[in-house]
């Protein structure tokens, strides 16, 4: 799906190699699309008393996801430029090294950019016309990110975090997965918690990330063993006890 939707090609444009996203991106994205598609059909059914067939093709879903910004110059007919969102495809559009680690720093507005360069002691870059307006920046993203990368190594991650917070510049230290899980922000929300499985013992579970004021979500069931819900699902579909027993019992040779 990543290959047929252009995702692997986007990775090639960014890394020179058509690699896969390091997560089960298509599965997760299509699952979310299925959820809101089914909910839309439920709303329609409750309004009109009519059901309908819901299809969510994985390749189409991924392609639509990619083309939102990467249609780019092919948005118009005839095309006025290449496909691919220029800023995302620019070399250097990535985390930068600090004096003691890595961080993501993204001065976005003219003020952000000028403030960042002034904080780094580079008044010349703060007033550089290449970065002074959106049209000029679009032609010089590579140089902008290159200059940020050169300056970021002059201070520690904590120093940059403090500076960027004071100047309202988007910034975040790069956390390893292990550190992200135990970061105070995430532990405070209770996103990852310990639970007891009836057969497998203690395990970590990832809870719902959303917050609902009146109906807060929670994890109500443990991670199922293979086939654990088969009988329950068949019963919901209208199968009787004996039919279920025949369906779930091993087939004899």
Named regions from a protein language model:
Residues 1-103, 107-108:
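Active-site-adjacent "lid/gating" segments in soluble enzymes
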Residues 2, 29-33, 107-111, 143, ...:
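Conserved active-site and cofactor/substrate-binding residues in soluble primary-metabolism enzymes
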Residues 38, 49, 116, 164, ...:
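Residue-level signal for nonpolar/aromatic packing positions in well-ordered secondary structure
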Residues 72-82, 183-197:
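Short, surface-exposed loop/helix-turn segments at secondary-structure junctions
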Residues 86, 91-167, 171:
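Aromatic-enriched alpha-helical interface/lid elements that frame and gate functional surfaces
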Residues 165-186:
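Conserved PLP cofactor-binding pocket of PLP-dependent enzymes
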Residues 182, 242-253:
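Amphipathic terminal alpha-helices
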Residues 196-246:
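Flexible, small-/acidic-enriched active-site or ligand-binding loops
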């Amino acid at each position: 799906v990543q290959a047929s939707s252009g995702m692997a090609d986007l990775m090639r444009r960014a890394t020179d190699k058509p690699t896969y996203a390091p997560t089960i991106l298509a599965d997760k994205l299509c699952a979310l699309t299925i959820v809101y598609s089914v909910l839309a059909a439920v709303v329609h059914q409750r309004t009109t008393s009519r059901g309908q067939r819901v299809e969510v093709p994985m390749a189409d879903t991924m392609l639509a996801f990619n083309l939102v910004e990467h249609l780019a110059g092919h948005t118009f007919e005839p095309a006025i430029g290449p496909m691919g969102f220029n800023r995302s495809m620019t070399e250097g559009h990535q985390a930068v090294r600090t004096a003691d680690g890595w961080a993501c720093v993204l001065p976005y507005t003219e003020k952000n950019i000028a403030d960042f360069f002034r904080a780094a002691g580079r008044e010349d870059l703060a007033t550089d016309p290449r970065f002074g307006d959106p049209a000029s920046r679009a032609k010089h993203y590579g140089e902008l990110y290159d200059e940020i990368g050169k300056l970021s190594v002059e201070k520690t991650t904590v120093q940059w975090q403090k500076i960027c917070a004071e100047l309202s510049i988007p910034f975040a230290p790069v956390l390893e997965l292990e550190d992200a899980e135990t970061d105070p922000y995430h532990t405070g929300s209770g996103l990852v918690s310990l639970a007891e499985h009836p057969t497998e013992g203690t395990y970590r579970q990832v809870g719902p990330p959303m917050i609902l004021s009146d109906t807060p979500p929670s994890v109500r069931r443990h991670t199922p063993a293979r086939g654990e819900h088969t009988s329950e699902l068949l019963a919901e579909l209208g199968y009787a006890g004996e039919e279920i027993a025949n369906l779930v019992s091993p087939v004899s040779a």
